[in-house]
Curated annotation (Swiss-Prot):
It is a peripheral membrane protein. Residues 57-237 form the tr-type G domain. It comes from Candida albicans (strain SC5314 / ATCC MYA-2876) (Yeast). Keywords: GTP-binding, Hydrolase, Membrane, Mitochondrion, Mitochondrion inner membrane, Nucleotide-binding, Protein biosynthesis. Promotes mitochondrial protein synthesis. May act as a fidelity factor of the translation reaction, by catalyzing a one-codon backward translocation of tRNAs on improperly translocated ribosomes. Binds to mitochondrial ribosomes in a GTP-dependent manner. GO terms for molecular function: GTP binding; GTPase activity; mitochondrial ribosome binding. GO terms for cellular component: mitochondrial inner membrane; mitochondrial matrix; mitochondrion. This is Translation factor GUF1, mitochondrial. The gene is GUF1. Its main location: mitochondrion. The keyword Hydrolase applies. It catalyses: GTP + H2O = GDP + phosphate + H(+).
Amino acid sequence: MLLRPNSGNTLKYGCLLTKRWLTTSKLLYSVEDMKIKIGQEQYRKALEERIDKIPIENYRNFSIVAHVDHGKSTLSDRLLEMTGVIKPGSKSQVLDKLDVERERGITVKAQTVSMFYNDGKQDYLLHLVDTPGHVDFRAEVSRSYASCGGALLLVDASQGVQAQTVANFYLAYSMGLKLIPIINKIDLDSANIPGAREQIETTFELDPNECIPVSAKTGLNVEQIIPSVIKNIPSPVCDVNKPLRALLVDSWHDPYVGVVMLVHIVDGRMKKGMKILSAHTNRTYDVKEVGIMYPDRTPTSFIKAGQVAYIIPGMKNPREALVGDTFYQMGKHEGLEPLPGFEEPKPMVFVGAFPADGKEFNAMDDQMQNLVLNDRSVTLEQETSNALGLGWRLGFLGSLHASVFKERLEKEYGAKIILTAPTVPYKIIYKNGEEKIVTNPDDFPDNQKHHDVESYMEPYVEAIMTVPNEYVGNVMTLCLNNRGEQKEIEYLTTGQVLLKYEIPTSQLVEDFFGKLKGCTKGYASLDYEEAGYRKSDIVKMQLCVNGEPQDALTTVIHRSQAQARGKEYVTRFKKFLSYQLFEVAIQAKINNKVVARETIKAKRKDVTQRLHAADISRYKKLLERQKEGKKQMKLSGRVTIKNDAYQAFLRRED
């Protein structure tokens, strides 16, 4: 039986570092209360003593699988309140550290928090690993799942199973995680609990009787979750007596202490002062600090097998922190195998980035480098554009990743930036057997080099969409217009349909999700995963103004879309160009062949306004001279295009 603060019993350090909701609704001491009551140093010792006494059999590592806006962060907050990690009513979305995560309601970086729970008989140490739900951050998701024994499968009672839920379920299931179905938002008038149970049974083949209906917002039934976690999720398979092996789950850069790494200790122990070795870079580091997230960094003397904790390794360059890497203790690593799952992040969307004001390049370069320090999945190279000047070629995991990066740059540094249209990595196979990946449309082979190429290949994704039944026809038409191929259709309930299509990645990054939302009145959801490369008839299209290619507007498209896309480009770009004293031709070209053209007529001065009406010969002479002058001007004149025109075009303004 847990002691309450007002009972007459003696308070023993380490016994009351938790609280849980009781039938009387009286709470035990929270983390903040205990720090104040017994002091920081005694609190730390009590914490270490408590951790050391808990056997690994009483550890539970779990995650939450959910679609965006199904209440994952709110449920996390309730669990933290229930276990005394935070006070009730404190700031929401505790695990979302970045401003952009709070504002968008998404998780970008994997986070963890440790929780203590006592069932009245014994202590348990729980690690909740909060993972990004979006496919762009799938590397963090898979590494996080690797450190868990199970997951809560969260489904919105009013919306039912959605695309992201399905995609993350399959990932969790393939990694052997034990899944506990949770139906959230049962307090809503639109909640359909029987319908949600039916979807969980038909889509995931889980027992509907095991579903726990809760309201994360009000806390209703949330107290049933942790006992279910303890009962159903297995303890981690690890051995504290074996040599150290730690899996790197995620990392971030702290301006004061450098790189902070989130690790899952699979075997052994790690403590401050230990020298550790990276399995993949072969670099060594001296551990400056270890501890648990409770909910923020809380230093301890050691961390041991089974824990998901943080370390500060004294790493200077954050790009050395490779997600999925294994760390050993130096001198005790002979014969040890790295933990499975290491994978270098592969950017799938590339954009050109340029400062709105060219004079700001140097200052923005420093800001860009600082932001990349905290996200090693972003690739960064300097490039030069004839149209926009000095800039960068950035590689991202997906279009959401690119959007989040741009938003962070603007909000954290106040930077104004121009992003070119997103492109994907195309594979070119030459006749001599050489293969090349092209990420910049300007580097795509033109007419002169075309004869050396055996074939062109473009990446595809398998898109998973859930839509209301009445919009299925609209979605099928949208997928067909975007060169999609139907793979599967499944009726989840009478009202919801799950569609699987294989779609070119290039079509997906061109606001496919926005179009999907538009044709379903916002009711559709989307997730996707890579589906490899396919041979494709893709071509480079250049936008030329008076014969001069505008490299910032060069794009790679499928030949079947060339004419329609070319017409759209020249018509739209014409709106942003000012009139000149000579005729301006705007052309879309493929292999030097014009596929679309628009013309801006020359500004014309009335040179005959002062002539007498009867002076025909003089009238003709002046018009002829003007015509000749404009001809010369067209040959030698250059069209000056302001940055505003490029910005407006790339923002797709009308």
